[in-house]
From Swiss-Prot:
It is found in: Cytoplasm. Gene3D superfamilies: Anticodon-binding domain, Bira Bifunctional Protein, Domain 2, C-terminal domain of ProRS. It comes from Methanothrix thermoacetophila (strain DSM 6194 / JCM 14653 / NBRC 101360 / PT). GO terms for molecular function: ATP binding; proline-tRNA ligase activity. InterPro entries: aa-tRNA-synt_IIb, aa-tRNA-synth_II, aa-tRNA-synth_II/BPL/LPL, Anticodon-bd, Anticodon-bd_dom_sf, Pro-tRNA-ligase_IIa, Pro-tRNA-ligase_IIa_arc-type, Pro-tRNA_ligase_II_C. This is Proline--tRNA ligase. Homodimer. It is an enzyme of class 6 (ligase). One of its GO terms (biological process) is prolyl-tRNA aminoacylation.
């Protein structure tokens, strides 16, 4: 962004969420939406650095027992069309390659909307016996979906640039079901490290992943009360194994179908990070993922060079402890620098002026507004790391308090209709498909599914009146 663009950038208040979000993506240089294909954005270098630090967390969590791999982007139509239920869920969203140069292709090639139909023909070749199981792999790739709805950067795209999809194969259905639980727990931990609490629910049968036995999803409540699905895990059972003939020889020499799972996260996790923690000044980033963790701003009064030398020394010390630090020694006024780095969400700002040097201290300002004086000696780095941990705790607690404030157990359809205008309604539900569809129609919101592990005392389904301990989250969704 040019200096003129920076001066002209005026961030709307976060209460005007849609405008705030789109302007912040530009002003903080996360993604540029001006690419000349609708629904496809370009990562700015700063935004891509943020993305890299975020995805490093999920890689660390998966690398414990998964192997990273990469499969081709193009999927032959003959493989893609094999799984009828799966294809029914994606057929209107597929981009097709029909020509190579000027020559029509004998077999059309799909740009992957997701990779089951690319990966599973290979698993048939890789898996031979029970000794090959469990198999756990993942890839981080781009996927393409012809979205006809209103596109939103990082939220609803035609090119998903950062799709992390894991695929596993197991000997039994029970082992696959356990893998789904492990996946959900790792996703919860992933978002905890981003200081983001999530709703976890089992999706209704009509909203499960095409071809799955069942689906579990994570949702984040956005500032306007809508929910954003930010992760899913699916138990596929033997459905795809039967289609692609993925079998193994068991201990008794018998051929059996594998049981499979798949689970994924996209750059929606970046959208959630921005939306949940950001404020009227811009991004607010947790320490772990901030491209710049500490910015040092010299406060120049009198002679410049002695102050700059002290700042350089502190920057060198911080960098020596693997802290991502930036010394902003440009000609702008301190206030302009504060504005710029607050917009980019830097967790800790250090201010150093002549008085600080004289007193042997530095002034630090955390991105949540906490201001402290710390000693300018060997204790400084550890003191800053403590502040980083405190900021993480503050961000999570603040986000959890907001999420809890947006969820309400309702006892009537009118109350539910009112609640979903600005939050999530927890609605008594008997669990039937008929009543589920009726709830969606009468409340005017999406049925997210049954909350995990939190039964209600007996209440009556708001549609049929039958007594039930079941319930569902309902919300307007992105």
């Amino acid at each position: 962004m040019t200096k003129k663009e920076e001066r002209d950038a005026k961030l709307p208040p976060k209460s005007n969420f849609s405008e705030w979000y789109h302007e912040l993506l530009r002003s903080a240089e996360i993604v540029d939406v001006r690419y000349p294909v609708k629904g496809m954005s370009v990562w700015y270098p700063f935004g891509f650095a943020l993305r890299s630090h975020v995805y490093q967390i999920i890689k660390e969590l998966l690398d414990v027992d998964h192997y990273e791999t990469q499969f081709p982007l193009l999927i032959p139509e003959t493989e893609f069309m094999k799984e009828a239920e799966h294809i029914k869920g994606f057929e209107d969203e597929v981009y097709w390659v029909t020509h190579g140069g000027r020559d029509p292709l004998d077999i059309k090639l799909a740009l992957r909307p997701t990779s089951e139909t690319a990966i599973y023909p290979m698993l048939k070749l890789w898996i031979r016996s029970h000794a090959d199981l469990p198999l756990r792999i993942y890839q981080i790739v781009n996927t393409f979906r012809y979205e006809t709805k209103h596109t939103r950067p990082l939220i609803r795209l035609r090119e998903i640039t950062s799709f992390k999809e894991a695929h596993t194969a197991h000997a039994t259905w029970e082992e696959a079901a356990m893998q789904v639980e492990i996946a959900i727990q790792r996703y919860i931990e992933f978002y905890r490290r981003l200081a983001i609490p999530c709703l976890v629910s089992k999706r209704p049968s009509w909203d499960k992943f095409p071809g799955a036995d069942y689906s579990i999803a994570l949702d984040v409540i956005m500032p306007d009360g809508r929910t954003l699905q930010v992760g899913t895990a699916h138990l596929l059972g033997t459905n795809f194994a039967k289609t692609y003939e993925i079998t193994y020889e068991d201990e008794h020499g018998e051929q059996r179908y594998v049981n499979q799972t798949c689970y994924g996260i996209s750059e929606r996790c970046i959208a959630a990070l921005i939306a949940v923690h950001g404020d009227d000044k811009g991004l607010v980033l947790p320490w772990r993922v901030a491209p710049v963790q500490v910015v040092i701003v010299p406060i120049i009064f009198g002679e410049r060079e002695p102050i700059i030398e002290v700042c350089r020394s502190i920057a060198s010390t911080l960098a020596g402890r693997n802290i991502r630090v930036r010394l902003d020694d440009g000609d702008e006024r301190p206030g302009a620098k504060f504005y710029k780095w607050e917009m980019r969400g830097v967790p800790v700002r250090i201010e150093i002026g002549p008085r600080d040097i004289k007193n042997g201290v530095v002034t630090i300002v955390r991105r949540d507004g906490v201001r402290k004086t710390l000693p300018m000696d060997e204790r400084l780095v550890d003191a800053i790391l403590i502040e980083a941990e405190e900021l993480q705790t503050v961000l999570y607690n603040r986000a959890k308090e907001f999420m809890d404030s947006k969820i309400k157990l309702v006892s009537s359809l009118d109350e539910a209709r009112s609640q979903v205008q600005s939050g999530v309604a927890r609605v008594p539900w008997c669990g039937s498909v008929e009543c589920g569809h009726a709830l969606e129609d009468q409340i005017g919101a999406n049925l997210l599914g049954e909350p995990r592990g939190d039964e209600l005392p007996p209440m009556r389904c708001l549609v049929c009146g039958r007594e039930s301990t079941g319930s569902t989250y309902m919300a307007r969704q992105y």
